[in-house]
Amino acid sequence: MNIYLTSGTPEFMNSLKEKHTKEKMVVLHGEGNTVLLHETTGKTVFSTPRKYEVLDSSGELNEQGYFVLNNIPVSDEGRPIFEHRFSNRARAIENEPGFIAIRVLRPIKADTYIILTEWTGPSSFEAWQTSQAYNKAHEKRGSDEGIDQRPNIFSSASYVTTYTTAKKSEDTQ
């Protein structure tokens, strides 16, 4: 499975989605930008996409939700360690209230992995961040065993981008 991302105006992203109704696409609206996400086992219809291979997934992406993309630049030598960590994740997030889906994305021609999660709304995501499941998933952060303490894994600082879909979910209104 692959995910392709492209950016443009809200109008163009919506028209592209409407043109390809048989494809699994979700329009995401963020701070000052709009992204069209295409999930497929085949080729994309985008002319200049950002390409990702899905390493791990759970749940079905929904056209009505709150998307959180944790963008993590990883060095070439750090890829095996980083991927191993995510292949052994606890999978506790799937049981959190408001959780819809997760995709762990390996970049095809770039260095930035994306951990994409979809929630019913921002309050669900924020509740997860204060949950025991979150603390368990991040318990080694900052310790000698934490992946963040290993030299040369990350090529630069990670950053988070958030998006909503055109149809507002109940707790994003």
Predicted feature descriptions by range:
Residues 14-33, 40-52, 94-100, 122-156:
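An amphipathic, aromatic/His-enriched active-site/gating alpha helix that lines ligand/cofactor pockets
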Residues 155-173:
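Catalytic "initiation/cleavage/transfer" segments centered on a nucleophilic residue
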Residues 103-105, 161:
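General small-molecule cofactor/ligand-binding pocket signal
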Residues 1-7, 28-41, 67-72, 105-131:
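Short, well-ordered beta-strand segments in beta-rich or mixed alpha/beta enzyme
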Residues 74-76, 121, 164:
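Non-catalytic surface loops within mature trypsin-like serine protease
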Residues 9-20, 77-101:
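Short amphipathic alpha-helical segments
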Residues 32-34, 44, 59-60, 166-170:
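A short acidic, often aromatic-flanked loop/helix-cap motif at beta-alpha or helix-coil junctions
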Residues 45-83, 88:
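Surface-exposed beta-loop interaction hotspot
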